[in-house]
């Protein structure tokens, strides 16, 4: 949400309750009751301490040595943002300068440094997912890490793996990698590894169930919608990518705005304490989304570690649920000292684990202004001023990776008569504003809150300013010697058509975050539906009525309906270029004119009609009471539901053509680890965690320092009368039902980052030889799907679990691809035993290999043979 959304919310939250010591907030008093659908989130206390895994041992040892000597003020400082507009970044914590810990800078976005300059605007997550290329996923993460580090950013607010794409109209689906748990998991994990290899803390988000933008937030008049998710669906679909992100060592998790099973994500003890920190072994820190904290004591007890941007119910008032109120809650005993110590230790341990105690730059940019100088704290009156932007160029040669991703993501859906690739001297007529520039200027719309010119990304906090943009119009004009351009969304009546002319029609479909409404779409695609914007369907039909050869180029945030024109005889080819970022033009012409064969594959299903989806995944509108978004479709999202309902889509998940052809041969399956039991072996025990004195600190530790120069509305940890706060310790805080300070037994499904380490034992390895049988060079993707036996109960008939992409193969050459399948990959979540259940020795499991979910080329049966289909 970030800065603009905070301003937009001020009016709607004006009558909200402000923070108060030891009190519940706007909505938290209601969160323990069951909702109308019967879903509830059982309590799980206390919050587990971090530091019990050997992979984080060194970082926690360093953090312990520092935290044990911190004052209460220093500890609180690191848990609470300084307030919106109270520093250079979209969020910053207070500091602990005695120990060398500065204000930690937190900044968007998953595709580039937001509200900055001289940075790369990479392709969006959905584009990266369409590459089905793990190396490019990792490379983008590395270069994002380099750029964020170069700007002095400690915490990158990405990647996004939630929403997962359950709702095809969902506004922020494009920030993630595709509508499948494994595709999201692999894309997220590779990105995290890349980012953190550069010493920047990655943040996996939004945890969890934020599948719709409208009504995601609570305010005084309306609770956020509740995503009602059963235990098995939660584990097998929505938690899957988070578990893999945690296994990759992610340093931070961001909670979602919405509720899950009637409890706000930022204070849902089941989600944070039990699942995230205990079962999945998360060792980093949990932060809120911006203004997504709804209570003070309640959120601390439930496992929240950092409040962002720090403000309470209404931003810019200088009030907070934490900050000085957290100091008060420690002094009066409402929040145990041990909980605060763990909160701070988690934050400091992540800082050490990324090596940020070394030569790490301070922020050298401002997300508040593009001017060189200005207020240091724009949210305050009479702020001191200084240099706020140093215009550090962090782009290096990252345009190469950006172009490669955008190019390798381009997905060829149709290519009748092999009309593509085009020849440089073909007579081209290019139509559509999506081919050209934004007439108002490159970055004229804040947070890309408009659809003008070529669509490079959606809108909202997940965006970045474009340092430059090569449009398709520019790139085509640079290559083609015979192209005419009609940058309009209305087909010109006076276009002359000659024999052999090719019409290239550009259309788009946009979406974004809820705080901006674009052309009647408040984030989600409410007005446009799944159709092209700006009369795109009509533009294609008009061109097809006049030209005998039409190529359609689609820039889209997700599934888009094509039925009005896809079967017209003149429509020869369709390319989906997704959201390509700054290299939109060059990446397209690389493929359009045949320098590269297209190798992208759909990261979602394209339906024939929106009615192909069940009503449960439609957008929900405002009722009189809280919206109940119940996941009645369960495990069956996207291609899974099409398979179950026996609905043939227009184009299936994973579909993507090439200018050449490929064969799959010599499939083999080998056993790596014998699965001798239904459930994994007993988890390893937890190791020791840091220990600290538990006595309540002296109140003087949060007294205002003498001669301290206060910044108005800046959030400090200090109290005017700390001694008085300590005296109120006799009052009993109304703790949530089920609250206890007695630790729970360790969940049997846990034991390491991501869960029981035995879950990630490689059970099988599958190899297949891919041969280029065509006449042009190209790359192929082998997609691996599992089919589980009936003995495990009802499961989707095919589930993507792995994929691999060849290098560029010359005609007649081959490459053998090998993919590994873990115990977890062939397991289901047992809701009774609360553990992952797999067939012994994998009996009955089938492993399918193909180029889409409906284009299978080979199959292996565990315990049987492999064969080519």
UniProtKB/Swiss-Prot annotation:
Glycans are attached at residues 77, 261, 332, 364, 399, 478, 728. Residues 1-19 form the signal peptide. It is found in: Secreted. The active site is at residue 289. GO terms for molecular function: beta-glucosidase activity. GO terms for cellular component: extracellular region. SMART domains: Fn3_like (SM01217). Transmembrane segments: none annotated. Pathway: Glycan metabolism; cellulose degradation. Its EC number is 3.2.1.21. Its main location: secreted. Gene3D superfamilies: Glycoside hydrolase family 3 C-terminal domain, Glycoside hydrolase, family 3, N-terminal domain, Immunoglobulins. Residues 681-691 have a biased composition (Pro residues). PROSITE patterns: GLYCOSYL_HYDROL_F3. One of its GO terms (biological process) is glucan catabolic process. It comes from the Eukaryota. InterPro entries: Cellulose_deg_GH3 (IPR050288), Fn3-like (IPR026891), Glyco_hydro_3_AS (IPR019800), Glyco_hydro_3_C (IPR002772), Glyco_hydro_3_C_sf (IPR036881), Glyco_hydro_3_N (IPR001764), Glyco_hydro_3_N_sf (IPR036962), Glycoside_hydrolase_SF (IPR017853). Keywords: Carbohydrate metabolism, Cellulose degradation, Glycoprotein, Glycosidase, Hydrolase, Polysaccharide degradation, Secreted, Signal. It catalyses: Hydrolysis of terminal, non-reducing beta-D-glucosyl residues with release of beta-D-glucose. The keyword Transmembrane helix does not apply. Pfam families: Fn3-like, Glyco_hydro_3, Glyco_hydro_3_C. Belongs to the glycosyl hydrolase 3 family. Beta-glucosidases are one of a number of cellulolytic enzymes involved in the degradation of cellulosic biomass. Catalyzes the last step releasing glucose from the inhibitory cellobiose. This is Probable beta-glucosidase F. It comes from Aspergillus fumigatus (strain ATCC MYA-4609 / CBS 101355 / FGSC A1100 / Af293) (Neosartorya fumigata). The gene is bglF.
